[in-house]
């Protein structure tokens, strides 16, 4: 089963992206994505919806 999550910018805290992941995965996801508020690429970490 997959659960929906959001990806939050580590610098400004804005939730910019939404995705899903496997429920059995223990580690948190983190990606380098573009943040329109910061106007640059930053690390986005997994948070609950």
Swiss-Prot record:
Pfam families in UniProt: Ribosomal_L33
UniProt-recorded Gene Ontology molecular function terms: structural constituent of ribosome
Coiled coil: none
Keywords: Ribonucleoprotein, Ribosomal protein
Alphabetical GO biological process terms: translation
GO CC entries: cytoplasm; ribonucleoprotein complex; ribosome
InterPro entries: Ribosomal_bL33, Ribosomal_bL33_sf, Ribosomal_zn-bd
HAMAP family per the UniProt record, alphabetical: Ribosomal_bL33
NCBIfam families: PRK00504.1 (NF001764), PRK00595.1 (NF001860), rpmG_bact (TIGR01023)
Similarity comment text for this entry: Belongs to the bacterial ribosomal protein bL33 family.
Protein name per UniProt: Large ribosomal subunit protein bL33
Provenance organism: Pseudothermotoga lettingae (strain ATCC BAA-301 / DSM 14385 / NBRC 107922 / TMO) (Thermotoga lettingae)
């Amino acid at each position: 089963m997959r659960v929906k999550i959001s990806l939050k910018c580590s610098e400004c805290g804005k939730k910019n992206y939404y995705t899903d992941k496997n429920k059995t995965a223990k580690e948190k996801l983190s990606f380098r994505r573009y943040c329109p508020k910061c106007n640059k690429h930053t690390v986005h970490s997994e948070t609950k919806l």
